[in-house]
Amino acid sequence: MAEQTFIMIKPDGVQRGLVGEIISRFEKKGFYLKGLKFVNVERAFAEKHYADLSAKPFFSGLVDYIISGPVVAMIWEGKNVVTTGRKIIGATNPAQSEPGTIRGDFAIDIGRNVIHGSDAVESANKEIALWFPEGAANWESSLHSWIYE
């Protein structure tokens, strides 16, 4: 199986109409969309997703933010998709994100940074299992041989 990552467009990204732009950037890179959900997140689910941050002082505000509106949860697949996906997204703090990255182009405040992306293969697997217990769609693009050797 090729490497997969979990990407979530946060409520601010949805409200600002950035869903198509964000999906386009991953598709143009050559990654495959293998799962997509447009959902309103329940508090308990958000707390489970961000459980590793539960001791941080910003945890409560982060959970409130994630449940404030719908999110787009996605599985993306491709060679080095976790590392490359993080580069496409940019630094967690938009002030440190390069122009050309999603956060560098569309975010200003760390508390409204548009998008979440798995930081490692292990966390991607955990997040995908949480958000997509049914698994990813089973398909391969007809463009595969034009993108990968």
Swiss-Prot record:
SMART domains attached to this UniProt entry: NDK
Cofactors named for this entry: Mg(2+)
Record's keyword annotation contains Kinase: yes
Enzyme class: transferase
Binding of ATP, residues: K10, F58, R86, T92, R103, N113
Active site: H116
Alphabetical keyword list: ATP-binding, Kinase, Magnesium, Metal-binding, Nucleotide metabolism, Nucleotide-binding, Phosphoprotein, Phytochrome signaling pathway, Transferase
InterPro entries found in the cross-reference section: NDK-like_dom, NDK-like_dom_sf, Nucleoside_diP_kinase, Nucleoside_diP_kinase_AS
Coiled coil stretches, renumbered: none
Record's keyword annotation contains Cell membrane: no
Any one of the GO BP annotations: GTP biosynthetic process
Catalysed reaction, written as an equation: a 2'-deoxyribonucleoside 5'-diphosphate + ATP = a 2'-deoxyribonucleoside 5'-triphosphate + ADP; a ribonucleoside 5'-diphosphate + ATP = a ribonucleoside 5'-triphosphate + ADP
An example Gene Ontology molecular-function term: nucleoside diphosphate kinase activity
Top-rank taxon, per record: Eukaryota
Name of a matching Pfam family: NDK
EC number: 2.7.4.6
Family, per entry: Belongs to the NDK family.
HAMAP family (UniProt xref): NDP_kinase (MF_00451)
Function as written in the Swiss-Prot or TrEMBL entry: Major role in the synthesis of nucleoside triphosphates other than ATP. The ATP gamma phosphate is transferred to the NDP beta phosphate via a ping-pong mechanism, using a phosphorylated active-site intermediate. This NDK is microtubule-associated.
Protein name, entry field: Nucleoside diphosphate kinase 1
Native source organism of the sequence: Pisum sativum
Lineage: Eukaryota, Viridiplantae, Streptophyta, Embryophyta, Tracheophyta
